[in-house]
Amino acid sequence: MRNYYEKRLSALVFECDQEHYWVNPLMMKEKIVKVASLVIGKRVETISASATLHDLVNALNVHHVGALVVSPDGKKIEGIVSERDVVRAMPGRLNELTDVRVHELMTADVITCTPDSSVASLMTVMTERRIRHVPVVDESGNLLSIISIGDVVKAHINELDVERKALSDYVNS
């Protein structure tokens, strides 16, 4: 087992002296986790832009999700609407909430990713833009799935745990 990790480390580190290590950028490619690995078999819930706020709240509750993709057909994306959008709509509008439609609450300029997007780059975008849900689309822009910040964080934690275990095994062997 020690040989395996020595080979891995020597492949990752291509040059070193007593104080510095230089990582081989070609070897870093294999560490890239793709969005596709997180959304395989994951169902995405959608809602119509003409649905009522009542319909939206019920759908969020029934499906146990924090956001729904707004779509007329389950493929094309018109927007995304989340629990935060519902909360933001409430101040000053409590009397008229029964008349509010999803298209009034949704974010129409939707940030999306593809199955080939890296989880690391998606984490950066979600953090910088302060968004918690990103629809996953194919090359034609059709909806495939949705990924949450929780999915991204779990993948990152798993990646760090594997790396920690590998280093621990190497040091202890």
Go through each PLM region and give its residues.
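Tandem CBS (Cystathionine beta-synthase) repeat/Bateman regulatory domains
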Residues: 2-173
